[in-house]
Amino acid sequence: MGKEKFSRSKPHVNVGTIGHVDHGKTTLTAAITSVLAAKFGGTAKAYDQIDAAPEEKARGITINTAHVEYETANRHYAHVDCPGHADYVKNMITGAAQMDGAILVVSAADGPMPQTREHILLARQVGVPYIIVFLNKCDMVDDAELLELVEMEVRELLDKYEFPGDTTPIIHGSAKLAMEGDKGPMGEQAIMKLADALDSYIPLPERAIDGAFLMPVEDVFSISGRGTVVTGRVERGIIKVGEEIEIVGIHDTQKTTCTGVEMFRKLLDQGQAGDNVGILLRGTKREDVQRGQVLCKPGSIKPHTHFTGEIYVLSKDEGGRHTPFFNNYRPQFYFRTTDVTGAIELPEGKEMVMPGDNVSIIVKLINPIAMEEGLRFAIREGGKTVGAGVVAKVIA
């Protein structure tokens, strides 16, 4: 299948479907592509094309994810859909498919179910900023009061996990009717309403280049007569020659000045998000900087050791541990470019964590790391990945 040219003319937003098994996530994904392709161009995808999600690897974990794209009048969307619950958990925790917003699919016939709740909680923990609800299978419910009841339940559940339940758009429809070409309010019209909600309710994400400058340190060299050069890939923002920057993590924060930016052995006056650069630092000694630290705009990110996280523990089949771990387990946490040892505190009443589980934990690292909510990490033992996680809340 040939790759279509990626249209850059419209702003780009990443979304995905979440929700309980068999509530219609994949059917809805197919319906969105077919209705919007007919209206705005693009490719309609059939249910089985999406359901046969290819395997991909993220942070050493194999995940099945289907990627589709579609356009509305104003935007271009990349949309992820996962075949199984475990794939959602892994996807959201590793950040393999970052979501600027999620479409929560709830069957009107069943109402919220255990995975509905779990996916909302995961969305909160991993920092999915916006949720829109598609109340599916409404053609199977004749009772308007019942629909209202289900809608109320969903809003309460969103509130419980700190999403704005009252103001969340909830669209009533039937993905199946839309797939069958039904032009009525439950069919294509519901899909168009959903598209409008995506456009109006999910704001455009901040582009990496607009963020505060941040570059994880990959390597450090000393160049005689010129000073210390730090190399890495700029994660966000822009660094200009002459700007003050901080070196954050592992040791006390230090201030320094960028006196040069190099890319492919050429001198530049700035480096920006996505660039692999060498940054020359004024008056900084080679031994003052190490892998695992970050260079950043002063004050934009702080070093921390204590945080809550949401983790997925690899199963034995995925090359993970063969045995459970217990409270105070001390693996290495791999942040950006380095490992830091930390101790895990399990939630109250949870005795142990089995391979294949996902769980909320509290971590204390032995060295501080430049950290903010949403930062991803791997959990390793002797260089082998045994889990993946994301910082949910910084404690200290």
Curated annotation (Swiss-Prot):
Keywords carried by this UniProt record: Cytoplasm, Elongation factor, GTP-binding, Hydrolase, Magnesium, Metal-binding, Nucleotide-binding, Protein biosynthesis
Predominant localisation class: cytoplasm
Pfam family, one: GTP_EFTU_D3
Highest taxon of source: Bacteria
PROSITE patterns, per the entry: G_TR_1, G_TR_2
GO cellular component: a single term: cytosol
Region (G1): 19-26
GO MF annotations in UniProt: GTP binding; GTPase activity; guanosine tetraphosphate binding; translation elongation factor activity
Region named G2: 60-64
Keyword Disulfide bond in annotation: no
Region listing for G3, in residue ranges: 81-84
Subcellular location: Cytoplasm
SUPFAM superfamilies the UniProt entry points to: EF-Tu/eEF-1alpha/eIF2-gamma C-terminal domain, P-loop containing nucleoside triphosphate hydrolases, Translation proteins
Domain tr-type G: 10-206
Family membership: Belongs to the TRAFAC class translation factor GTPase superfamily. Classic translation factor GTPase family. EF-Tu/EF-1A subfamily.
Name the record gives this protein: Elongation factor Tu 2
Origin species: Albidiferax ferrireducens (strain ATCC BAA-621 / DSM 15236 / T118) (Rhodoferax ferrireducens)
Native organism taxonomy: Bacteria, Pseudomonadati, Pseudomonadota, Betaproteobacteria, Burkholderiales
Gene responsible for this protein: tuf2
